[in-house]
Amino acid sequence: EPETIKFKLHYSSAYKKRIFVPLAFIAIALAFFVVAFIIDYVWSSVALAFIFASQLVGNIWVLPVSITADDNGLTLKDVIGKTNVKRGEIVSIQPLSALDGSVQLKWRGYDVKIGGKTMLPVPKWVTNDSNIVVVTIKEPKRTAYQYAISCPDEATLQQLCKWGS
């Protein structure tokens, strides 16, 4: 009789370990994933959701990106370098001042009034319309995406417009 009780206790303990250890591991892994996702979302200069939502008509999403030129054309990346923004052919690069006045800039989902009061603090380069160019990218079989790019100076702006012509 004592042997039977001992066996049952041993079996019960092993069964619990077999079930709860993997569950605990999965829970910890999920917790790390959620924390990493939140940190990345909050601290990343460009949230993926905003990149994919940038095809809204009449709106240009302002992205702090860097541009490099090579034999393959222009490559746009966010300032951290995590997200490759280029997903199609670059159609045009124009100074913001040359665009129609109805175009509205957005920064992280909020409207940005160039040269006017804004609803939230935005980087200075966003409100300096003289140094912003707009890159239009056309994806195969999809709508054109537009990105507002900050240029550090007039020479860079002119160079970008030359590449886009």
Can you annotate each of these PLM segments?
Residues E3-I5, V65, N131-V133:
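Short structural boundary motif marking the start of a folded domain
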Residues S12-Y15, K77-A148:
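Non-transmembrane, membrane-adjacent beta-strand/coil modules in membrane-associated proteins
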Residues E1-I38, K124-W125, E139-Q146, P152-E154:
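N-terminal membrane-targeting/pre-transmembrane regions
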